Amino acid sequence: MDYIQTLFTSVNQVGEKIDSYKSSLNLINPGTCENLSKEVSKDILLSNYAFTGVRADVTKGFCTSPWFTVSHAFALGSQVLPPYSFSTMFGGEPLFLRGSVDNDGAVQAMLNCTWNSNVLSKVQMQLSNGAVPNMCQIEHDHKGKDFSFSFKAMNPWYEEKLTGIYIISLLQSVTPKLSLGVEALWQKPSSSIGPEEATLSYMTRYNAADWIATAHLNGSQGDVTATFWRKLSPKVEAGVECQLSPVGLNHSAALMTGPKPEGLTSVGVKYEFAQSIYRGQVDSKGRVGVYLERRLAPAITLAFSSELDHPNRNAKVGLGLSLELPGSDEMIQQQQQQLAAQTA
């Protein structure tokens, strides 16, 4: 028993020394692996903003505590968005729920549960009778003082000794500015589809005061993605994303035509003004895109999207309008306060 007690005492002492050393480094939480290059890929580049055709969104809020809204979305001439969809959101502590249904009967639902300020669980489901496959996704995120851990399961099922896609990722701060991460993916489809597959990815992030650099390496296919973000002024940001692949950026096409090294570099800029946000982008394939979002009033937002593909002589244009209708005296008062602050 004395040996066991001595062993546990030694382990505790080692753990205390490690914690003391980590505290002396002044490490911070590095964010999540999913948001490794968020400043470039999600905030500046147009992949999350560009659209085609005409769209309109009408949102009505009923209360703010808990938060409850309903929304109607209309789209014309879009190859991605359905002609009509109805969605609703309900949020409070600790739950947040969102659901939508479109004109084809496709249903999407999401549930977020915040256990505490550092632990978050998510469940997403998609049911459709069309070309889009059904999907169920379970996520769990844990943020520590100097690390972030995430687990994700897509379409998990117990048959054939567990099938689905499972992803585990860890991002750890090693200095106040430098973070290193690893992500493991295990995919096991049913025996009628194909064999199982496992991959490892490695990532790093360097966060300086006014610029951020990231790199991501897919260990199995050799794909490399690097980004650089810089804040040029309080209202202007710029970013660069470079993708390199030894087998081609479109892996499904590479299976049919054979591997072909390919690369793509995108440069983007974001201007943020009091009533509008402008995003512009150009890539190495000769495509130029712009996205402009203008708030005409506290409840009315106008969006314009355009892309010119010079080598292929193709152009895409989109125009959108968002209308937010207050549904309570409290929400009307909030909009009036917002308008007064903007005109002051």
From Swiss-Prot:
Keywords: Ion transport, Membrane, Mitochondrion, Mitochondrion outer membrane, Porin, Protein transport, Transmembrane, Transmembrane beta strand, Transport. It is found in: Mitochondrion outer membrane. It holds the Pfam family Porin_3. It is a multi-pass membrane protein. One of its GO terms (biological process) is protein insertion into mitochondrial inner membrane. InterPro entries: Porin_dom_sf (IPR023614), Porin_Euk/Tom40 (IPR027246), Tom40 (IPR037930), Tom40_fungi (IPR005686). GO terms for cellular component: mitochondrial outer membrane translocase complex; mitochondrion; pore complex. GO terms for molecular function: ATP hydrolysis activity; porin activity; protein transmembrane transporter activity; protein-transporting ATPase activity. Forms part of the preprotein translocase complex of the outer mitochondrial membrane (TOM complex) which consists of at least 8 different proteins (tom5, tom6, tom7, tom20, tom22, tom37, tom40 and tom70). Interacts with mitochondrial targeting sequences. Belongs to the Tom40 family. Channel-forming protein essential for import of protein precursors into mitochondria. This is Probable mitochondrial import receptor subunit tom40. The gene is tom40.
